[in-house]
Regions:
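Flavin (primarily FAD) cofactor-binding/catalytic cores of flavoenzymes
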Residues: 1-77, 83-258
Length: 258
């Protein structure tokens, strides 16, 4: 396919029926090898499609397994490097991630702008692969597809792969598309009116860390406009999974219902 043929690029695989237009037997390039890719690949293989996936390091999500509890965390982490060093020295990395999870938002907020950027540049891909894991049953199914040749994993540039191989469709499996979200009418109009601004590092929208209230172009709280979930990734980082969203919704409900 022509990589510029946008009609054959699925930008958001979570849109209703997004994968329905990919015909049976198609050869599909997935960009990204995280949990979104896993779901997309299993769906497409069920339609007899061949799937090739690529990412910079070719890392697949780790697999869930029971793990013991850790007694606690250090009193503070001064940098992303501190976090990664601590994780490396734990006897059970799954238990370490579980211990970090309730404190991740606080730790993220304690990093300055430079520290957050260092994390995103150097540690994010490893964090995502270990933090967002596959269920064992899903992992076995994916491993079976890889063994049969229905799914292939490639490390490197998606552009090079697309130019050197023939694909019928491309599916973006890189997670939430912040640029697309901010360009949709509701958020775009708020940003144009100065009632919202992009979040730190271009992720989601900027919000008050405690209340979720949107911040205006000048940094002041927007009147009665709040966000939860993925729109708060720049502010909180850990804001995409059900436990965190549930906690945010609970706090917001307590704030709004008086």
């Amino acid at each position: 396919m022509n990589v510029l043929d946008r009609s054959r690029v699925v930008r958001d695989p979570w849109e209703p029926d997004a994968l329905e237009r990919i015909p049976r037997g198609a050869h599909v390039l997935c960009i990204g090898t995280g949990l979104t890719f896993v779901d997309v690949a299993i769906t497409l293989v069920a339609k007899s499609c061949r799937v090739t996936a690529t990412s910079r390091h070719g890392l697949l999500p780790a697999i869930h397994a029971p793990s013991p509890s850790l007694p606690g965390l250090p009193t503070s982490f001064t940098s992303p490097l501190d976090v990664m060093r601590w994780l490396r020295h734990q006897p059970d990395w799954r238990a370490a991630f579980a211990a970090l999870r309730p404190e991740t938002q606080r730790i993220w907020r304690s990093f300055d702008d430079v520290g957050q950027r260092q994390f995103l540049r150097h540690a994010r891909r490893y964090w995502d692969a270990h933090r967002h894991r596959m269920a064992p049953e899903v992992a076995r199914l994916l491993e079976d597809h890889i063994a049969r040749g229905s799914v292939r994993i490639r490390r490197g540039s998606a552009q090079d792969l697309a130019e050197s191989h023939e694909f019928d469709f491309v599916v973006l499996c890189t997670g939430p598309d912040d640029s697309a979200a901010l360009s949709r009418p509701p958020l775009a109009s708020l940003i144009t009116a100065g009632q919202a601004r992009p979040g730190p590092h271009g992720m989601g929208v900027d919000t008050d860390a405690d209340t979720g209230q949107l911040l205006t172009a000048t940094g002041a709280p927007a009147s009665r406009i709040y966000a939860i979930g993925t729109l708060r990734r720049g502010t909180l980082w850990e804001s995409t999974a059900i436990p965190e969203i549930r906690s945010e919704a609970r706090r917001l409900a307590a704030l709004l219902v008086v």
